[in-house]
Design a protein with these regions (language model features):
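C-terminal alpha-helical "lid/dimerization" subdomain adjacent to the S-adenosyl-L-methionine
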Residues: 4-5, 9-18, 130-183
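Conserved alpha-helix/loop element of class I SAM-dependent methyltransferases that forms part
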Residues: 17-36
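Class I SAM-dependent methyltransferase SAM/SAH-binding core
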Residues: 39, 44-91
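A short acidic, Gly/Pro-enriched loop at the edge of an enzyme's catalytic core
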Residues: 90-102
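A short SAM/SAH-binding and catalytic strip from SAM-dependent methyltransferases
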Residues: 100-113
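A short glycine-rich, Lys/Arg-flanked "PGG" loop and its adjoining helix->strand segment in the class I
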Residues: 115-130
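C-terminal lobe and adjacent flexible extensions of AdoMet/dcAdoMet transferase-like proteins
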Residues: 183-195
Length: 195
């Protein structure tokens, strides 16, 4: 079964309600200057990957599908320096502490073992790194998707599933009526110095 094809179709439907990638990234940045390495985990068609190059020095797209990665390499803009790697189940070949920001768009519901996945996220984040998660808000319109309730993940459930002694919830990001963002960090004390 080609789950990537199903994921691509639902992603295309959902993106019809999504603001431009640059607007989403700026909302997560919240007037704070970022640099360093941005990892787009579950990069799919590169919607956020390529746009993030405006704000970060190094950009890496990660996806399970080698076909997706090959397509991104074939079609990426000439000006792009983004790198792409394939993840294997819950791991990547990236070194420990390589990410200033890890970004994910609507992939948590597709991950069977969230704890194992979070372990890899924590390994990849720098000590002051941040995890940015963009999810679909269940609304009356449901974004026009023919989706069951398990397509959506409520904010509270997302926070409960991810936060632990090493990953701390920072804030909600109001994207629009159809999407919400959530920020986590490994080091709450370091993060608070910037605010």
């Amino acid at each position: 079964m080609d789950t990537n094809k199903n994921n691509n179709n639902s992603s295309k439907e959902a993106k019809a309600y999504l603001p431009p990638a640059e607007d989403v990234i700026l909302k997560f940045m919240n007037k704070r200057a970022y640099k360093g390495t941005f990892i787009d985990f579950g990069c799919n068609d590169g919607y956020f990957t390529f746009t993030s190059e405006k704000f970060f020095t190094n950009v890496i797209g990660v996806d399970l599908s080698i076909d997706t990665i090959n397509e991104l390499l074939r079609t990426r803009p000439e000006s792009s320096d983004a790198k792409f790697i394939r993840s294997h189940n819950y791991t990547t070949a990236l070194p420990d502490g390589s990410a200033d920001v890890i970004f994910m768009f609507h992939i948590l519901k597709k991950i069977p073992n969230v704890k194992q996945f979070v372990k890899e996220i924590k390994r990849l984040l720098k000590e002051d790194g941040e995890l940015w998660i963009l999810e679909i808000e269940k609304t009356e319109a449901d974004l026009g998707l023919k989706a069951s309730d398990d397509y959506f993940i409520p904010k509270e459930e997302l926070i409960t599933r991810l936060k632990d002694d090493e990953l701390h919830f920072i804030e909600y990001i109001d994207i629009n009526e159809s999407y919400y963002g959530v920020k986590f960090t490994k080091n709450e004390d370091l993060f608070m110095r910037f605010y």
